């Protein structure tokens, strides 16, 4: 049984607190990370390589329980960015080519399209408070910058034909790098 624990530095292991996993969630591999603002824990739980569940735990509210955002083991929903309790997810749910949705923790079953699926395969990232989408168009990358409402800010001009990767940065950063 995979488990995720909270460990406070300079404390003993016996004081660790179980956050997720164990006998109630058998046969899952578990991973997690903290959001950039350090206020939320993203918990991913999977049983295969086709997808994984997503839970988000509020780290500010004492004794909060993880909120299930996505419960399908054969789909993906990855956190790109959060603005307080609103999370921007890249998902393949109802979108084989990918889409970006927003979800508020107070209403985790209500997903709103931010950047809908297109005819081209999509990959997504965030940086500087924006969303970046890399579309695969005619075997080359096309990069679009979106605001958090899904409005196109601009197309990123690339120096030539090829594949571009990267476009990740922290919220307050004004520069980002790609290859």
Residue ranges: model-predicted function:
Residues 1-179:
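Peripheral, non-catalytic segments that deliver or gate enzyme domains
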């Amino acid at each position: 049984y995979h488990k995720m624990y909270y460990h406070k530095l300079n404390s003993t292991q016996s004081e660790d607190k179980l956050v997720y996993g164990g006998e109630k969630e058998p046969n899952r591999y578990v991973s997690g990370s903290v959001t950039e603002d350090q206020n939320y824990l993203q918990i991913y739980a999977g049983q295969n390589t086709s997808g994984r569940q997503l839970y988000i735990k509020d780290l500010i509210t004492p004794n909060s329980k993880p909120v299930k955002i996505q419960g399908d083991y054969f789909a993906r929903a990855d956190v790109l960015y959060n603005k307080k309790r609103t999370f921007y997810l890249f998902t393949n749910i109802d979108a084989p080519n990918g889409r970006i949705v927003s979800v508020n923790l107070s209403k985790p079953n209500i997903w709103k399209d931010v950047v809908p699926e297109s005819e081209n395969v999509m990959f997504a990232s965030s940086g500087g408070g924006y969303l970046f989408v890399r579309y695969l168009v005619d075997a080359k990358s096309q990069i679009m910058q979106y605001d958090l409402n899904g409005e196109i800010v601009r197309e990123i001009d690339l120096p030539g034909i090829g594949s571009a990767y990267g476009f990740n940065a922290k919220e307050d950063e004004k520069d980002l790098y790609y290859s």
